Amino acid sequence: MSQANLTSLSGLNPSCIYRFESAILPPFLNTHIVMSTKKFPVPLSYFSMPLGLFALGLSWRYGARIGLLPTWAAETLLAAAFALWLLLVIAYIIKIRFFRPEFLQDLQDLVQCCFISAIPITTILAGLAALPYQTLPAKGLILLGTAGQLAFAMYRAGGLWRGVHTLDATTPIVYLPTVATNFVSATAMAVLGWSDYAWLFLGAGLFSWLSLEAAILSRLRTGTPVNAPVRGIVGIQLAPAFVGCGAYFAASGGHIDTFALLLIGYGCLQFLLLLRLLPWMLEQGFSPSFWGFSFGLAAMTGCGFHLIAEQRLLFLGYFLATAGSGLVMLLLLATLNLARQGRLLVK
């Protein structure tokens, strides 16, 4: 495989990819495992796929509740997202067990490390998807994901305060460990009826977003360009405003007010700026990194449904709901085409 393909699939600099014959696990495991010399076929970043599908399914569930979509469409999408999430969790357990050096490389890499946050985020979303069917297990998933995201934030975000971060690693992926995680936790707490905790998590996500935004945009403006094969991760820039607005709706009761309109307005601006960047992002064609757009697009759909439900800015509401849903479906079709061509998994 060429260096360009490796970069496209893993998001890592090819010079940072190593081959391991074997590794000895920590003494407390008292186990010696022979490692494959091949790359693990499922990159950590692929958790962004169920992340986007879960988020869209939950937006569609709200759309069904207000009579805009059939219930079966939302529940079918959520079931597909749950199945994909479960497969990826199993795959990552296998990676930890039998591809330990690659797992440790994920943990230590300044960029890939952030994708680990997608695991607790999708665990929370899986709990929300299952909540109408199995309340107790669903609550368990939500609490497990929330505890996991806080633990990882302590490791990842807290660890960066020692001055170990770099400018090149300051891309929108940095939002995941403290912004996306806390917004999703806020939504889940609100759904469970724990409103005070919802506001706590919303505050954690909101102020984390504000503290990171200027640094990330400054790096995108003045730093070296993001590598062409992984430019899709810049699409994560769409997420904070719309995901934060969704969390605010969950915590505040779902009504359109001035603060919600402020968030939607900023999200719309990010959408327009990212549209302008699409030709630059697509210089080397579509890659799975474009799933970085999916969380923001799915949340944009939900914001559109809220506008429609409240009969506010109806044209904008229908545009956000239609564009968000359609573009996530386009991502799904493009990904299925990669799979058909045998270009989805790392070889």
Kindly label every feature range from the protein language model.
Residues 35-59, 74, 78-81, 100-127, ...:
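Juxtamembrane helix-loop boundaries in multi-pass membrane proteins
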Residues 60-73, 129-139, 187-199, 248-258, ...:
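Helix-coil boundary and interhelical linker segments in multi-pass alpha-helical membrane proteins
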Residues 76-87, 137-150, 198-209, 258-268:
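Structural signature of hydrophobic alpha-helical transmembrane segments
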Residues 87-98, 145-156, 209-216:
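Membrane-water interface of transmembrane alpha-helices
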Residues 155-156, 187, 211-220, 243-250, ...:
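Alpha-helical transmembrane segments in multipass membrane proteins, preferentially the mid-helix core
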Residues 203-263:
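Aromatic-anchored, glycine/proline-accented short structural segments
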